[in-house]
A protein has these predicted regions:
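Extracytoplasmic gate region of multi-pass secondary transporters
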Residues: 54-59, 181, 254-326
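C-terminal transmembrane helical hairpin of 12-TM major facilitator-type secondary transporters
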Residues: 312, 318-321, 338-396
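Central cavity-lining transmembrane alpha-helices of secondary-active solute carriers
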Residues: 75-93, 318-331
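C-terminal membrane-cytosol helix-exit motif in multi-pass small-molecule transporters
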Residues: 189, 220-242, 451-459
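Cytosolic juxtamembrane N-terminal segment immediately preceding the first transmembrane helix
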Residues: 1-49
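Glycine-rich segments within core transmembrane alpha-helices of 12-TM secondary carriers
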Residues: 143, 163-192, 415-428
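Cytoplasmic membrane-interface "Motif A"-like loop-to-helix N-cap segments
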Residues: 96-108, 336-350
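Intracellular juxtamembrane helix-capping segments at the cytosolic ends
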Residues: 144-158, 391-406
Length: 468
Protein backbone atom coordinates (compact mmCIF):
# COMPACT_ATOMS: atom_id res chain seq x y z
CA UNK A 1 0.00 0.00 0.00
CA UNK A 2 1.58 3.23 -1.17
CA UNK A 3 0.36 6.71 -0.32
CA UNK A 4 1.40 9.84 -2.14
CA UNK A 5 1.07 13.56 -1.43
CA UNK A 6 -2.02 13.57 -3.69
CA UNK A 7 -3.66 11.03 -1.42
CA UNK A 8 -3.15 13.38 1.47
CA UNK A 9 -4.23 16.63 -0.13
CA UNK A 10 -6.82 17.29 2.57
CA UNK A 11 -4.62 15.92 5.36
CA UNK A 12 -2.83 18.71 7.19
CA UNK A 13 -0.92 18.81 10.45
CA UNK A 14 2.03 17.05 12.02
CA UNK A 15 0.11 13.84 12.65
CA UNK A 16 -0.23 13.00 8.94
CA UNK A 17 2.63 11.29 7.11
CA UNK A 18 3.46 12.77 3.70
CA UNK A 19 3.87 9.35 2.11
CA UNK A 20 4.08 5.77 3.30
CA UNK A 21 5.06 2.53 1.59
CA UNK A 22 5.76 -0.37 3.98
CA UNK A 23 6.61 -2.63 1.03
CA UNK A 24 9.66 -0.46 0.20
CA UNK A 25 12.32 -1.68 2.61
CA UNK A 26 14.60 1.29 1.90
CA UNK A 27 12.06 3.89 3.06
CA UNK A 28 9.89 1.95 5.53
CA UNK A 29 10.20 3.42 9.04
CA UNK A 30 10.39 0.26 11.11
CA UNK A 31 10.67 2.16 14.41
CA UNK A 32 7.47 4.13 13.75
CA UNK A 33 5.59 0.98 12.74
CA UNK A 34 6.51 -0.88 15.92
CA UNK A 35 5.89 2.18 18.09
CA UNK A 36 2.42 2.39 16.59
CA UNK A 37 1.87 -1.32 17.20
CA UNK A 38 2.80 -1.20 20.89
CA UNK A 39 0.80 1.93 21.71
CA UNK A 40 -2.31 0.73 19.88
CA UNK A 41 -1.90 -2.72 21.44
CA UNK A 42 -1.85 -1.21 24.94
CA UNK A 43 -4.97 0.84 24.22
CA UNK A 44 -6.65 -2.16 22.56
CA UNK A 45 -5.99 -4.16 25.72
CA UNK A 46 -7.81 -1.46 27.69
CA UNK A 47 -10.64 -1.68 25.15
CA UNK A 48 -11.01 -5.41 25.80
CA UNK A 49 -10.86 -4.78 29.55
CA UNK A 50 -13.78 -2.34 29.24
CA UNK A 51 -15.68 -4.66 26.87
CA UNK A 52 -15.46 -7.70 29.15
CA UNK A 53 -15.63 -5.88 32.48
CA UNK A 54 -19.38 -6.70 32.68
CA UNK A 55 -18.60 -10.42 32.19
CA UNK A 56 -16.43 -10.29 35.33
CA UNK A 57 -19.10 -8.46 37.33
CA UNK A 58 -22.43 -9.91 36.15
CA UNK A 59 -22.01 -13.45 37.60
CA UNK A 60 -21.70 -11.89 41.07
CA UNK A 61 -24.40 -9.19 40.84
CA UNK A 62 -26.93 -11.25 42.80
CA UNK A 63 -24.29 -12.13 45.38
CA UNK A 64 -23.67 -8.44 46.19
CA UNK A 65 -27.30 -7.38 46.47
CA UNK A 66 -29.13 -7.51 43.13
CA UNK A 67 -31.85 -10.07 42.42
CA UNK A 68 -31.98 -10.74 38.68
CA UNK A 69 -33.31 -13.88 36.99
CA UNK A 70 -31.14 -16.19 34.87
CA UNK A 71 -32.55 -14.84 31.56
CA UNK A 72 -31.93 -11.27 32.74
CA UNK A 73 -28.31 -12.09 33.56
CA UNK A 74 -27.77 -13.84 30.20
CA UNK A 75 -29.22 -10.81 28.39
CA UNK A 76 -27.04 -8.48 30.42
CA UNK A 77 -23.92 -10.50 29.55
CA UNK A 78 -24.97 -10.62 25.89
CA UNK A 79 -25.55 -6.87 25.48
CA UNK A 80 -21.86 -5.80 25.21
CA UNK A 81 -21.55 -8.22 22.29
CA UNK A 82 -24.59 -6.76 20.55
CA UNK A 83 -23.18 -3.25 21.02
CA UNK A 84 -19.70 -4.26 19.87
CA UNK A 85 -21.02 -5.83 16.68
CA UNK A 86 -23.06 -2.74 15.81
CA UNK A 87 -20.29 -0.31 16.75
CA UNK A 88 -17.68 -2.23 14.76
CA UNK A 89 -19.71 -1.45 11.65
CA UNK A 90 -19.01 2.20 12.46
CA UNK A 91 -15.38 1.86 13.53
CA UNK A 92 -14.43 -0.17 10.44
CA UNK A 93 -14.77 2.92 8.22
CA UNK A 94 -13.01 5.36 10.56
CA UNK A 95 -9.28 4.68 9.95
CA UNK A 96 -9.05 6.36 6.52
CA UNK A 97 -11.35 9.19 7.66
CA UNK A 98 -10.07 10.09 11.13
CA UNK A 99 -6.55 8.70 10.98
CA UNK A 100 -4.86 6.50 13.56
CA UNK A 101 -4.03 9.21 16.09
CA UNK A 102 -7.48 10.77 16.56
CA UNK A 103 -9.36 7.49 16.29
CA UNK A 104 -7.26 5.65 18.89
CA UNK A 105 -6.96 8.54 21.37
CA UNK A 106 -10.63 9.56 21.32
CA UNK A 107 -11.89 5.97 21.39
CA UNK A 108 -9.76 5.24 24.44
CA UNK A 109 -11.18 8.28 26.23
CA UNK A 110 -14.72 7.03 25.58
CA UNK A 111 -13.95 3.95 27.70
CA UNK A 112 -14.09 6.13 30.81
CA UNK A 113 -17.90 6.27 30.67
CA UNK A 114 -18.77 2.54 30.95
CA UNK A 115 -15.87 1.76 33.31
CA UNK A 116 -16.79 4.59 35.67
CA UNK A 117 -20.49 3.71 35.43
CA UNK A 118 -20.00 0.05 36.36
CA UNK A 119 -17.89 1.11 39.33
CA UNK A 120 -20.57 3.44 40.65
CA UNK A 121 -23.39 0.93 40.15
CA UNK A 122 -21.61 -1.95 41.88
CA UNK A 123 -20.66 0.27 44.81
CA UNK A 124 -24.34 0.81 45.64
CA UNK A 125 -26.25 -2.20 44.18
CA UNK A 126 -29.65 -0.61 43.64
CA UNK A 127 -29.61 0.42 39.97
CA UNK A 128 -32.65 -0.46 37.83
CA UNK A 129 -32.12 -3.20 35.26
CA UNK A 130 -32.42 -0.83 32.30
CA UNK A 131 -29.55 1.27 33.61
CA UNK A 132 -27.25 -1.73 33.78
CA UNK A 133 -28.31 -2.63 30.23
CA UNK A 134 -27.21 0.86 29.11
CA UNK A 135 -23.86 0.42 30.86
CA UNK A 136 -23.47 -3.01 29.25
CA UNK A 137 -24.15 -1.46 25.85
CA UNK A 138 -21.59 1.31 26.45
CA UNK A 139 -19.02 -1.35 27.35
CA UNK A 140 -19.39 -2.47 23.74
CA UNK A 141 -17.38 0.62 22.70
CA UNK A 142 -14.32 -1.37 23.72
CA UNK A 143 -15.33 -4.17 21.38
CA UNK A 144 -16.24 -1.80 18.57
CA UNK A 145 -12.76 -0.28 18.61
CA UNK A 146 -11.20 -3.52 17.33
CA UNK A 147 -12.52 -2.95 13.81
CA UNK A 148 -10.78 0.40 13.66
CA UNK A 149 -7.55 -0.37 15.48
CA UNK A 150 -6.62 -3.52 13.53
CA UNK A 151 -7.02 -2.14 9.97
CA UNK A 152 -5.25 1.03 11.06
CA UNK A 153 -2.25 -0.95 12.30
CA UNK A 154 -2.18 -3.02 9.10
CA UNK A 155 -1.35 0.17 7.15
CA UNK A 156 2.04 0.35 8.88
CA UNK A 157 3.42 -3.14 8.07
CA UNK A 158 4.42 -5.00 4.90
CA UNK A 159 2.41 -8.07 3.93
CA UNK A 160 5.22 -10.44 4.91
CA UNK A 161 4.91 -9.25 8.54
CA UNK A 162 1.14 -8.81 8.64
CA UNK A 163 0.46 -12.11 10.39
CA UNK A 164 2.95 -11.43 13.17
CA UNK A 165 1.98 -7.77 13.67
CA UNK A 166 -1.78 -8.31 13.66
CA UNK A 167 -1.45 -11.53 15.65
CA UNK A 168 0.55 -9.76 18.35
CA UNK A 169 -1.87 -6.85 18.53
CA UNK A 170 -5.02 -8.94 18.55
CA UNK A 171 -3.56 -11.62 20.81
CA UNK A 172 -2.15 -9.25 23.42
CA UNK A 173 -5.32 -7.17 23.16
CA UNK A 174 -7.35 -10.32 23.81
CA UNK A 175 -5.39 -10.75 27.04
CA UNK A 176 -7.51 -7.86 28.31
CA UNK A 177 -10.36 -10.37 28.66
CA UNK A 178 -8.46 -12.73 30.96
CA UNK A 179 -6.78 -9.77 32.69
CA UNK A 180 -10.05 -8.25 33.88
CA UNK A 181 -11.49 -11.64 34.83
CA UNK A 182 -8.33 -12.63 36.73
CA UNK A 183 -7.77 -9.36 38.59
CA UNK A 184 -11.41 -8.77 39.56
CA UNK A 185 -11.74 -11.51 42.24
CA UNK A 186 -8.27 -10.69 43.55
CA UNK A 187 -8.67 -6.93 43.84
CA UNK A 188 -12.19 -6.67 45.27
CA UNK A 189 -11.20 -8.22 48.60
CA UNK A 190 -8.42 -5.77 49.39
CA UNK A 191 -9.27 -3.52 52.31
CA UNK A 192 -6.70 -1.06 50.95
CA UNK A 193 -9.36 0.07 48.47
CA UNK A 194 -11.65 1.40 51.21
CA UNK A 195 -11.03 4.90 49.87
CA UNK A 196 -12.80 3.97 46.61
CA UNK A 197 -16.17 3.97 48.37
CA UNK A 198 -18.37 1.87 50.61
CA UNK A 199 -18.02 -1.91 50.73
CA UNK A 200 -20.56 -4.62 49.92
CA UNK A 201 -21.33 -7.97 51.54
CA UNK A 202 -20.89 -10.84 49.07
CA UNK A 203 -22.89 -13.99 49.75
CA UNK A 204 -21.44 -17.49 49.19
CA UNK A 205 -23.49 -20.72 49.38
CA UNK A 206 -23.14 -22.20 52.85
CA UNK A 207 -20.39 -19.77 53.87
CA UNK A 208 -20.15 -16.53 55.82
CA UNK A 209 -20.60 -13.27 53.94
CA UNK A 210 -17.41 -11.61 52.69
CA UNK A 211 -16.71 -7.88 52.72
CA UNK A 212 -15.72 -6.69 49.22
CA UNK A 213 -15.14 -3.47 47.31
CA UNK A 214 -16.52 -4.49 43.93
CA UNK A 215 -16.19 -0.97 42.49
CA UNK A 216 -12.40 -1.42 42.64
CA UNK A 217 -12.74 -3.89 39.74
CA UNK A 218 -13.77 -0.92 37.59
CA UNK A 219 -12.00 2.08 39.09
CA UNK A 220 -8.54 0.48 39.01
CA UNK A 221 -8.50 0.66 35.18
CA UNK A 222 -9.24 4.38 34.85
CA UNK A 223 -5.60 5.59 35.23
CA UNK A 224 -4.42 3.11 32.58
CA UNK A 225 -7.15 4.21 30.19
CA UNK A 226 -6.13 7.86 30.60
CA UNK A 227 -2.45 6.99 30.11
CA UNK A 228 -3.32 5.11 26.91
CA UNK A 229 -5.28 8.07 25.55
CA UNK A 230 -2.35 10.40 26.28
CA UNK A 231 0.22 8.13 24.61
CA UNK A 232 -1.97 7.78 21.53
CA UNK A 233 -2.48 11.54 21.17
CA UNK A 234 1.19 12.32 21.84
CA UNK A 235 3.03 9.71 19.79
CA UNK A 236 0.86 8.22 17.06
CA UNK A 237 0.92 9.26 13.40
CA UNK A 238 -1.69 8.74 10.69
CA UNK A 239 -1.29 7.22 7.23
CA UNK A 240 -3.21 9.13 4.53
CA UNK A 241 -5.42 6.60 2.75
CA UNK A 242 -7.47 7.75 -0.21
CA UNK A 243 -10.72 5.92 0.47
CA UNK A 244 -14.13 7.33 1.28
CA UNK A 245 -16.97 5.36 2.83
CA UNK A 246 -18.43 4.41 -0.54
CA UNK A 247 -15.11 3.03 -1.78
CA UNK A 248 -14.74 0.93 1.33
CA UNK A 249 -17.98 -0.93 0.59
CA UNK A 250 -16.55 -2.54 -2.57
CA UNK A 251 -15.38 -5.41 -0.37
CA UNK A 252 -18.92 -6.78 -0.39
CA UNK A 253 -18.74 -7.66 -4.08
CA UNK A 254 -15.88 -10.04 -3.33
CA UNK A 255 -17.07 -13.53 -2.38
CA UNK A 256 -14.05 -14.08 -0.13
CA UNK A 257 -15.34 -11.35 2.18
CA UNK A 258 -18.29 -13.58 2.97
CA UNK A 259 -16.29 -16.82 3.27
CA UNK A 260 -13.81 -15.20 5.66
CA UNK A 261 -16.69 -13.75 7.68
CA UNK A 262 -18.08 -17.25 8.20
CA UNK A 263 -14.65 -18.52 9.27
CA UNK A 264 -14.03 -15.66 11.68
CA UNK A 265 -17.42 -16.22 13.30
CA UNK A 266 -16.19 -19.74 14.04
CA UNK A 267 -12.95 -18.48 15.61
CA UNK A 268 -13.42 -15.07 17.22
CA UNK A 269 -17.18 -15.46 17.56
CA UNK A 270 -16.53 -18.55 19.68
CA UNK A 271 -13.75 -16.88 21.67
CA UNK A 272 -15.75 -13.75 22.50
CA UNK A 273 -19.05 -15.57 23.00
CA UNK A 274 -17.68 -18.08 25.47
CA UNK A 275 -15.53 -15.46 27.22
CA UNK A 276 -18.73 -13.56 28.04
CA UNK A 277 -20.80 -16.58 29.06
CA UNK A 278 -18.22 -18.90 30.68
CA UNK A 279 -18.86 -17.70 34.25
CA UNK A 280 -22.64 -17.85 33.98
CA UNK A 281 -22.52 -21.31 32.41
CA UNK A 282 -20.36 -22.55 35.27
CA UNK A 283 -22.70 -21.11 37.90
CA UNK A 284 -25.89 -22.38 36.26
CA UNK A 285 -24.55 -25.86 35.48
CA UNK A 286 -22.31 -26.68 38.43
CA UNK A 287 -22.84 -23.90 40.95
CA UNK A 288 -25.37 -21.91 42.91
CA UNK A 289 -27.54 -21.37 39.82
CA UNK A 290 -28.45 -25.07 39.64
CA UNK A 291 -31.42 -25.70 41.96
CA UNK A 292 -30.56 -29.41 42.06
CA UNK A 293 -27.23 -28.56 43.70
CA UNK A 294 -27.83 -25.49 45.89
CA UNK A 295 -31.04 -24.29 47.51
CA UNK A 296 -31.17 -20.80 48.99
CA UNK A 297 -28.35 -18.25 49.15
CA UNK A 298 -25.62 -17.02 51.44
CA UNK A 299 -24.63 -18.69 54.71
CA UNK A 300 -28.09 -20.28 55.05
CA UNK A 301 -27.91 -21.97 51.62
CA UNK A 302 -28.40 -25.73 51.65
CA UNK A 303 -26.08 -27.97 49.63
CA UNK A 304 -28.22 -30.77 48.20
CA UNK A 305 -25.35 -32.99 47.02
CA UNK A 306 -23.47 -34.25 50.06
CA UNK A 307 -19.69 -33.70 49.89
CA UNK A 308 -19.74 -31.61 46.71
CA UNK A 309 -17.43 -28.58 46.68
CA UNK A 310 -19.23 -25.85 44.72
CA UNK A 311 -16.71 -24.28 42.30
CA UNK A 312 -16.18 -20.54 42.43
CA UNK A 313 -16.26 -19.38 38.78
CA UNK A 314 -13.89 -16.47 39.36
CA UNK A 315 -11.11 -19.01 39.95
CA UNK A 316 -11.54 -20.50 36.49
CA UNK A 317 -13.16 -18.13 33.99
CA UNK A 318 -9.96 -16.21 33.19
CA UNK A 319 -8.24 -19.42 32.03
CA UNK A 320 -10.26 -19.70 28.82
CA UNK A 321 -9.53 -16.21 27.46
CA UNK A 322 -5.92 -16.54 28.64
CA UNK A 323 -5.42 -19.74 26.63
CA UNK A 324 -7.22 -18.34 23.59
CA UNK A 325 -5.24 -15.09 23.59
CA UNK A 326 -1.98 -16.95 24.21
CA UNK A 327 -2.64 -19.27 21.27
CA UNK A 328 -3.28 -16.26 19.05
CA UNK A 329 0.06 -14.70 19.97
CA UNK A 330 2.10 -17.92 19.75
CA UNK A 331 0.66 -19.13 16.45
CA UNK A 332 0.81 -15.76 14.63
CA UNK A 333 4.53 -16.13 13.69
CA UNK A 334 3.87 -19.72 12.54
CA UNK A 335 1.20 -18.50 10.13
CA UNK A 336 3.73 -16.12 8.56
CA UNK A 337 5.90 -19.15 7.73
CA UNK A 338 3.27 -21.65 6.62
CA UNK A 339 0.30 -19.52 5.60
CA UNK A 340 -2.94 -19.28 7.54
CA UNK A 341 -5.27 -21.73 5.79
CA UNK A 342 -3.70 -24.92 7.16
CA UNK A 343 -4.06 -23.61 10.72
CA UNK A 344 -7.65 -22.51 10.10
CA UNK A 345 -8.29 -26.08 8.98
CA UNK A 346 -6.70 -27.45 12.17
CA UNK A 347 -8.72 -24.95 14.21
CA UNK A 348 -11.98 -26.12 12.66
CA UNK A 349 -11.26 -29.81 13.16
CA UNK A 350 -10.13 -29.12 16.74
CA UNK A 351 -13.31 -27.20 17.48
CA UNK A 352 -15.48 -30.04 16.18
CA UNK A 353 -13.75 -32.50 18.51
CA UNK A 354 -13.57 -30.25 21.58
CA UNK A 355 -17.19 -29.11 21.33
CA UNK A 356 -18.32 -32.72 20.97
CA UNK A 357 -16.28 -33.66 24.07
CA UNK A 358 -17.67 -30.72 26.08
CA UNK A 359 -21.29 -31.64 25.35
CA UNK A 360 -20.84 -34.62 27.68
CA UNK A 361 -20.26 -32.20 30.54
CA UNK A 362 -23.27 -29.96 29.89
CA UNK A 363 -25.78 -32.18 31.71
CA UNK A 364 -24.60 -32.40 35.35
CA UNK A 365 -25.12 -35.75 37.08
CA UNK A 366 -26.30 -34.79 40.58
CA UNK A 367 -26.50 -38.38 41.86
CA UNK A 368 -23.26 -37.98 43.83
CA UNK A 369 -20.47 -35.53 44.56
CA UNK A 370 -18.03 -37.70 42.60
CA UNK A 371 -20.24 -37.71 39.51
CA UNK A 372 -20.69 -33.94 39.72
CA UNK A 373 -16.96 -33.35 40.10
CA UNK A 374 -16.20 -35.59 37.11
CA UNK A 375 -18.78 -33.75 35.02
CA UNK A 376 -17.31 -30.41 36.03
CA UNK A 377 -13.82 -31.52 35.03
CA UNK A 378 -15.07 -32.62 31.62
CA UNK A 379 -16.89 -29.31 31.17
CA UNK A 380 -13.88 -27.25 32.26
CA UNK A 381 -11.22 -29.03 30.18
CA UNK A 382 -13.52 -29.18 27.17
CA UNK A 383 -14.11 -25.44 27.36
CA UNK A 384 -10.38 -24.77 27.61
CA UNK A 385 -9.79 -26.86 24.48
CA UNK A 386 -12.44 -24.84 22.66
CA UNK A 387 -10.64 -21.65 23.65
CA UNK A 388 -7.32 -23.09 22.46
CA UNK A 389 -8.55 -23.97 18.97
CA UNK A 390 -10.49 -20.72 18.59
CA UNK A 391 -7.29 -18.82 19.45
CA UNK A 392 -5.33 -20.71 16.79
CA UNK A 393 -8.04 -19.84 14.26
CA UNK A 394 -7.99 -16.19 15.29
CA UNK A 395 -4.30 -16.01 14.37
CA UNK A 396 -4.62 -17.92 11.10
CA UNK A 397 -7.62 -16.05 9.68
CA UNK A 398 -5.87 -12.72 10.28
CA UNK A 399 -2.91 -14.02 8.27
CA UNK A 400 -5.18 -15.13 5.45
CA UNK A 401 -6.98 -11.83 4.92
CA UNK A 402 -3.92 -9.71 3.99
CA UNK A 403 -2.88 -12.52 1.60
CA UNK A 404 -6.28 -12.78 -0.08
CA UNK A 405 -7.10 -9.07 -0.45
CA UNK A 406 -5.14 -6.03 -1.63
CA UNK A 407 -4.01 -3.63 1.10
CA UNK A 408 -6.95 -1.20 1.22
CA UNK A 409 -9.54 -3.95 0.94
CA UNK A 410 -7.75 -6.11 3.50
CA UNK A 411 -8.22 -3.40 6.11
CA UNK A 412 -11.93 -3.17 5.32
CA UNK A 413 -12.40 -6.94 5.37
CA UNK A 414 -10.60 -7.22 8.71
CA UNK A 415 -12.93 -4.56 10.09
CA UNK A 416 -16.06 -6.17 8.65
CA UNK A 417 -15.32 -9.74 9.72
CA UNK A 418 -14.37 -8.51 13.19
CA UNK A 419 -17.64 -6.58 13.38
CA UNK A 420 -19.80 -9.60 12.63
CA UNK A 421 -17.81 -11.95 14.88
CA UNK A 422 -18.15 -9.45 17.74
CA UNK A 423 -21.82 -10.42 17.94
CA UNK A 424 -20.51 -13.64 19.53
CA UNK A 425 -21.39 -12.72 23.14
CA UNK A 426 -24.87 -11.63 22.04
CA UNK A 427 -25.55 -14.69 19.89
CA UNK A 428 -24.20 -17.08 22.51
CA UNK A 429 -26.26 -15.47 25.25
CA UNK A 430 -29.47 -15.50 23.23
CA UNK A 431 -28.81 -18.95 21.77
CA UNK A 432 -28.24 -20.53 25.17
CA UNK A 433 -31.32 -18.81 26.61
CA UNK A 434 -33.66 -19.73 23.74
CA UNK A 435 -32.32 -23.12 22.59
CA UNK A 436 -30.74 -24.52 25.72
CA UNK A 437 -27.07 -25.30 26.23
CA UNK A 438 -26.76 -28.71 24.53
CA UNK A 439 -28.67 -27.86 21.30
CA UNK A 440 -26.66 -24.66 20.98
CA UNK A 441 -23.38 -26.56 21.22
CA UNK A 442 -24.62 -29.01 18.57
CA UNK A 443 -25.17 -26.02 16.27
CA UNK A 444 -21.55 -25.08 17.02
CA UNK A 445 -20.37 -28.47 15.74
CA UNK A 446 -22.38 -28.08 12.53
CA UNK A 447 -20.95 -24.58 11.98
CA UNK A 448 -17.38 -25.79 12.53
CA UNK A 449 -17.84 -28.68 10.06
CA UNK A 450 -19.10 -26.18 7.46
CA UNK A 451 -16.02 -24.02 8.07
CA UNK A 452 -13.67 -26.99 7.64
CA UNK A 453 -15.21 -27.69 4.23
CA UNK A 454 -14.98 -24.02 3.17
CA UNK A 455 -11.35 -23.76 4.27
CA UNK A 456 -10.29 -26.91 2.45
CA UNK A 457 -12.10 -26.20 -0.81
CA UNK A 458 -11.37 -22.47 -1.08
CA UNK A 459 -8.07 -21.88 0.71
CA UNK A 460 -6.09 -24.95 1.83
CA UNK A 461 -6.20 -27.76 -0.76
CA UNK A 462 -3.62 -28.05 -3.54
CA UNK A 463 -4.76 -25.80 -6.37
CA UNK A 464 -7.21 -23.89 -4.16
CA UNK A 465 -8.59 -20.72 -5.82
CA UNK A 466 -7.22 -18.49 -3.03
CA UNK A 467 -4.32 -20.40 -1.54
CA UNK A 468 -3.49 -18.61 1.70
Amino acid sequence: MTTTPNAATARRGSEWLDSWDPEDESTWDKRLAWQTLWITTFTLTMCFVAWFLPSAIIPKLNAIGYSFSKPQLYWLAATPGLAAGLLRLVWMVLPPIMGTRKMVALTTLLLVFPVLGWGVRTMVPNAPYWELLVLAFLAGIGGGAFSGFMPSTSYFFPKRMAGTALGLQAGIGNFGVSLVQLITPWIIGFGMFWWMGISQQMKFPGKADQQVWYQAASFVWLPFILIGAFLAWRYLKSVPIKANIRQQFDIFSNQDTWWMTILYIMTFGTFSGLSAQFGLLMINLYGAGNAAIVQGSGASAQLLVQGYDVPDPVKYVFLGPLIGAGARVLFAPLTDRTGGAIWTLISGVGLVGSIWWTIGGLTPDTSSAEALAAGFDRFLYGMLLIFLFSGIGNASTFKQMPMIFEKRQAGGVIGWTAAIAAFGPFLFGIGITVMGVVPFYVVGIVWAVMCVVITWVRYARPGAPKKS
